[in-house]
Regions:
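N-terminal module-boundary/linker segments of secreted carbohydrate-active enzymes
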Residues: 1-85
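Substrate-binding cleft of extracellular glycoside hydrolase catalytic domains
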Residues: 71-177
Length: 177
């Protein structure tokens, strides 16, 4: 793992620096951390609690997904709040749980839509090899990016460091995410 520079650490929040140092000094090339992704399709199931009930231990990492961001009435709408709660669970477990987020980006501008590009008709607007910011599809992309940025800002403001994995299946093969 590359060493964090003093500048990176001075600019980072206290919790971000603590997480980075923990991963660098206690985990890198020494341990494997377990994790559990939360469900975005069924809010009635708490996957972390299921792991704890089955094993008597909490996973080190709890994963969340911005997949359903902005989709009213869908499960997984409260991923940010759940992640903040997981991080703050230190009161019960004696240590913070590590938060990771991914983003299965659904087709921009559609209510629902698929997240695999092969199943959508959406195209990134390009003009002469450059992103066309005047195209309506650009507005849809920007709107989605702004929604995610708002959620990441909530996490930052709550002091929650995030292992961020956006578009982790962008290469098209979920086997290697």
């Amino acid at each position: 793992m590359p060493n964090a520079t003093a500048c990176e650490l001075s600019m980072a929040g206290k919790n971000k620096a603590r997480l980075l140092n923990y991963l660098k000094s206690e985990v890198w090339e020494k341990k494997t951390l377990s994790g559990q992704m939360d469900l975005t399709w069924d809010d009635s199931i708490d996957m972390v609690k299921k792991v704890y009930s089955s094993t008597g231990k909490y996973p080190a990492i709890s994963g969340y997904d911005f997949m359903n961001i902005g989709l009213s009435g869908w499960s997984g709408e409260n991923q940010t709040e759940e992640a903040i709660s997981w991080w703050n669970n230190a009161k019960n477990t004696g240590k913070h749980g590590i938060v990771t987020f991914c983003w299965h980006w659904r087709e921009p501008g559609k209510s629902g839509g698929d997240f695999y590009s092969a199943k959508t008709n959406f195209t990134i607007p390009m003009k002469n090899g450059v992103l066309d910011t005047s195209h309506s599809n650009f507005s849809k992309i920007k709107a989605d990016l702004d929604k995610v940025a708002t959620e990441l800002t909530k996490l930052k403001n709550a002091g929650v460091p995030v292992l961020w994995r956006p578009l982790h299946e962008a290469g098209g093969d979920p086997q290697y995410n």
